[in-house]
């Protein structure tokens, strides 16, 4: 059974491990292996958004809800991360820094129950290819909101400082489409 506070406590305890990243990956994998339990604890997603479950200078735990067909442009985290999907699908495109911006470096599709660890230098973009909300637990080895990061223009791949407000607008635009689709029915 997934209990939010126990999950948070387990992740905090994992920070004491020699390889905290690997320890957190195991905790996330165990949790998303029972997606209905996570849904029961965190609630059925109705809208896109980012819910902060825990935040400190060493650890951030988010419930990330990607709206239908939502795309978030290339960005980095500058800390390790573990992503676990408990509903839907997340397509990650990976990039490398180049002299003229980014170059493509592969992709990985995550489905319900899938988990992926991301190193602190990873640059990726995220797409929810489905017509439904994708739900994921994201755990970061630091303060996700206070760490200076970068984003890249999705067309030119030119680097710029990460704009949290712009990222949140992407979620809000997705919610506007969701609401419009609800009124069309």
For the regions a language model picked out, list residue spans one by one.
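A short beta-loop-beta micro-motif enriched in histidine and acidic residues
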Residues: 55-59, 68-82, 103
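A short glycine-rich, His/Asp/Glu-containing loop-to-beta-strand
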Residues: 39-70
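N-terminal leader/capping segments at the start of a protein or of a new domain
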Residues: 1-37
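Short beta-strand His + acidic residue motifs that chelate non-heme Fe in jelly-roll/DSBH
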Residues: 73-74, 92-93, 118, 124-130, ...
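Glycine- and acidic-residue-biased ligand/ion/polar-headgroup-sensing regions
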Residues: 77-97
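Short acidic-glycine-tyrosine-enriched beta hairpin
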Residues: 97-124
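Double-stranded beta-helix
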Residues: 131-182
């Amino acid at each position: 059974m997934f209990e939010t506070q126990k999950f948070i406590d387990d992740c905090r305890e994992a920070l004491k491990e020699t390889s905290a990243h690997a320890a957190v990956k195991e905790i996330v994998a165990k949790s998303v292996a029972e997606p209905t339990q996570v849904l029961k604890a965190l609630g059925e997603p109705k809208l896109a958004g980012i819910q902060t479950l825990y935040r400190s200078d060493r650890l951030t735990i988010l419930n990330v809800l990607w709206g239908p067909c939502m795309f978030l442009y290339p960005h980095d985290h500058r800390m390790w991360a573990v992503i676990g999907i408990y509903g839907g699908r997340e397509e990650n495109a990976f990039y490398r820094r180049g002299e003229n911006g980014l170059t493509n470096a592969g992709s990985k599709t995550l489905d319900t129950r899938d988990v992926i660890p991301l190193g602190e230098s990873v640059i990726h973009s995220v797409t929810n290819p489905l017509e439904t909300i994708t739900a994921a637990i994201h755990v970061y080895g630091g303060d996700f909101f206070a760490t200076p990061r970068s984003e890249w223009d999705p067309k030119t791949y030119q680097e710029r400082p990460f704009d949290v407000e712009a990222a949140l607008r992407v979620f809000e635009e997705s919610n506007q489409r969701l609401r419009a689709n609800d009124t069309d029915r």
